[in-house]
Curated annotation (Swiss-Prot):
Provenance organism: Caldicellulosiruptor saccharolyticus (strain ATCC 43494 / DSM 8903 / Tp8T 6331)
UniProt key word Hydrolase: yes
One of the record's GO molecular function terms: 2-phosphosulfolactate phosphatase activity
Annotated protein name in UniProt: Probable 2-phosphosulfolactate phosphatase
Catalytic activity entry: (2R)-O-phospho-3-sulfolactate + H2O = (2R)-3-sulfolactate + phosphate
Cofactor(s) this protein cannot do without: Mg(2+)
Cited HAMAP family: ComB
InterPro entries according to UniProt: ComB-like, ComB-like_sf
Amino acid sequence: MKIITFSHYKEVTDDVLKDSYAVVIDLLRATSTMIWAISNGAKGIIPVEDISEARLLKRLDESVLLGGERGGLKIEGFDLDNSPLSYKKEAIFGKTVVMTTTNGTRALKKASCAKRIFLGSFINAKKTAEYIMKETLHYNIDTISIVCAGTEEKFTLEDILCAGYFVDLFIENFPDVFLDDLSLASHVLYKKFENDPHEILKYSYHYNHLKKLGFEADLEFCLRKDFVDCVCEFRNLVVEKV
């Protein structure tokens, strides 16, 4: 099994993704929020790149909720922001959410040429990795691509740290694994800080940006490991539970 990691979505190359299963990670916060929303009973998440596209879908179907952020903050006129803590069961159960974020929704769209696309986060990594391993073995897939969303088209530390956890899970279970250099680096980073990711992330840009905006509770939430059993897949333009 080959594990290929991309540091941000702009680096993604179709020739690698087209034969692989992809894991898209926007740890802080889009994929964490989408996974939590689906686990709380959202019918589906429709990721879109632009605010105008989200508003158009709302005009076409008033029953959908609008969620997302720009610069980390709720978009004017939207129902929800990008905090996982906003996606309570009573707010989203049975609903479809149209979501647009600065990085995560674009990363999902960029990965669309992969054979299958899964959402990754610390909160559901183990369950997701187990499912991917089972499916790749069954269908003879030999490449897993980890697509880090990044922040504003740049490398971001928290996504790489989470990628390292996925690499760790894959290494434990696949008998023969080839890691590209970024997969290897992400794994080394993860193993050093696996017991306290805050220890390194407290120096990182996006972590501190969210902290300054008052989202400390989101940081704690998104850095907790494996308390969600939900595996989420992006298929036919919608994020749904597998």
